[in-house]
């Protein structure tokens, strides 16, 4: 069985990569049984609750992350160093229940996937 990892490495607003990444996950979820989602770099900003993108005339798609569990996508990982670099920590109240991993263990996890798709 092929395993696919989606990596979100860009901030949520200003570009459409986050929304496109979610759309891609939902589109291929019926094809691949093992899909995991990783948040690294500015991608960790996708996880912050109570964002108000309408103030910059952007659509708030981040609430769509909450339906990942309906697609049986439960392996969600975040880079601890990326959180700390942005003044966040694993005690923050994020929109998802995520496993926070150090950079080394995050790389070890990613090494197990057949395909890695970056958004």
UniProtKB/Swiss-Prot annotation:
User: Keywords for this entry?
Assistant: Cytoplasm, tRNA processing
> Which Gene3D superfamilies does the annotation name?
DsrEFH-like (3.40.1260.10)
Q: Which domain of life is it from?
A: Bacteria
Q: Enumerate the subcellular locations listed in this protein's record, separating them with semicolons.
A: Cytoplasm
For this UniProt entry, what's an example GO CC term?
cytoplasm
What are the disulfide bonds?
Answer: none
* InterPro entries to which the protein is assigned, alphabetical: DsrEFH-like, Sulphur_relay_DsrE/F-like, Sulphur_relay_TusC, Sulphur_relay_TusC/DsrF
GO annotation, biological process: tRNA processing
Q: How does it assemble?
A: Heterohexamer, formed by a dimer of trimers. The hexameric TusBCD complex contains 2 copies each of TusB, TusC and TusD. The TusBCD complex interacts with TusE.
**Task performed by this protein:** Part of a sulfur-relay system required for 2-thiolation of 5-methylaminomethyl-2-thiouridine (mnm(5)s(2)U) at tRNA wobble positions.
HAMAP family this protein is in? Thiourid_synth_C
- Stored NCBIfam families: PRK00211.1 (NF001238), sulf_tusC_dsrF (TIGR03010)
Instruction: Report the sequence similarity comment from the record.
Output: Belongs to the DsrF/TusC family.
Q: What is this protein called?
A: Protein TusC
Organism for this UniProt entry: Buchnera aphidicola subsp. Acyrthosiphon pisum (strain APS) (Acyrthosiphon pisum symbiotic bacterium)
């Amino acid at each position: 069985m092929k395993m696919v990892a989606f990596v979100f490495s860009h901030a949520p607003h200003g570009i459409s990569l986050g929304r496109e990444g979610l759309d891609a996950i939902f589109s291929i979820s019926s094809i691949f049984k093992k899909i995991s989602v990783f948040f690294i770099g500015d991608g960790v900003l996708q996880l912050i609750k109570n964002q108000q993108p309408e103030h910059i005339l952007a659509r708030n798609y981040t609430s769509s992350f909450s339906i990942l569990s309906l697609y049986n996508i439960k392996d969600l990982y975040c880079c601890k160093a990326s959180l700390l670099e942005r003044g966040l920590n694993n005690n923050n109240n994020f929109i998802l229940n995520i496993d926070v991993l150090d950079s080394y263990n995050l790389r070890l996890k990613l090494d197990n996937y057949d395909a890695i798709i970056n958004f």
